[in-house]
């Protein structure tokens, strides 16, 4: 969030001028939760998500779970996340990541909020946990999708949407291109992962929401469809996933905190 502290208003206005109707900002630990609420209450086009990112899983505890549950009552908080596993950097022990992930999945199911799943270098473990917990009551999105087609098919079979980042515009994105070709358009989203992973030709620079247009154009090219047709489909997917009214009342933490 610090990356946009000085020019957040200008960045959002630039995105709106590009025709972007919805944006999602994510609070990945307790220090950012109130900032997310401040942002979503200041900009009508921006919605929020909160959760404990796998990097911060070692800090997850029962009290923090209660704090999250309270924030989830805000109707403009439309998703639980990012939650998941990151075995690339391992900022938190793997056992802590798995424990926090499983507990937060239970809260997401009870709250009927979609989960935003972060998974890096943890494909098999993520699929195993989601498969074990899958009962038809958990939905969500695999954020910044980076795995192969075989994994994509497993996530899709569990009902998840795949969110495509700006890396799809890179020359070496052959595996991700195969995923986009295969995945039904109603199970795709486009994202920036700002400030990271700016699409070509902005690679290496600070990413921002307005750049998502470049990702959408690439998806349209791969699908052999018009850009506006793809954009409209992705808009509907966002609305269906995040802006539905079927929210649960009980977002309490599981009794067993382990």
Descriptions of predicted regions:
Residues 1-258:
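Mid-domain alpha/beta scaffold segments of enzyme catalytic cores
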């Amino acid at each position: 969030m610090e990356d946009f502290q000085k020019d957040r208003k200008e960045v959002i206005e630039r995105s709106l001028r590009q025709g972007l109707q919805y944006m999602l900002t994510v609070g990945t630990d307790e220090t950012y939760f109130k900032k997310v609420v401040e942002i979503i209450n200041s900009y009508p086009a921006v919605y929020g998500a909160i959760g404990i990112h796998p990097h911060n899983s070692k800090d997850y505890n029962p009290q923090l779970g209660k704090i999250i549950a309270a924030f989830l009552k805000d109707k403009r908080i439309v998703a639980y996340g990012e939650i998941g596993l990151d075995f690339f950097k391992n900022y938190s022990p793997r056992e802590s990541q798995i424990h926090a992930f499983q507990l937060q999945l239970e809260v997401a199911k009870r709250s009927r909020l979609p989960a935003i799943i972060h998974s890096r270098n943890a494909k098999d473990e993520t699929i195993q946990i989601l498969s074990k917990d899958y009962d038809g009551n958990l939905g969500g999105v695999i954020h910044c999708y980076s795995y192969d087609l075989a994994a994509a098919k497993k996530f899709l079979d569990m009902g998840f949407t795949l969110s495509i980042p700006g890396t799809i515009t890179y020359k070496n994105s052959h595996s991700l291109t195969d995923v986009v070709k295969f995945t039904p358009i109603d199970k795709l989203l486009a994202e920036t992962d700002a400030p990271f992973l700016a699409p070509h030709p902005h690679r290496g620079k600070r990413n921002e929401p307005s750049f998502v247009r470049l990702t959408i154009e690439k998806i349209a090219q791969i699908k052999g469809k018009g850009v506006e047709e793809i954009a409209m489909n992705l808009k509907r997917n966002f609305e269906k996933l995040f802006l539905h009214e079927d929210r649960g009342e009980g977002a309490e933490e599981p009794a067993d905190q382990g």
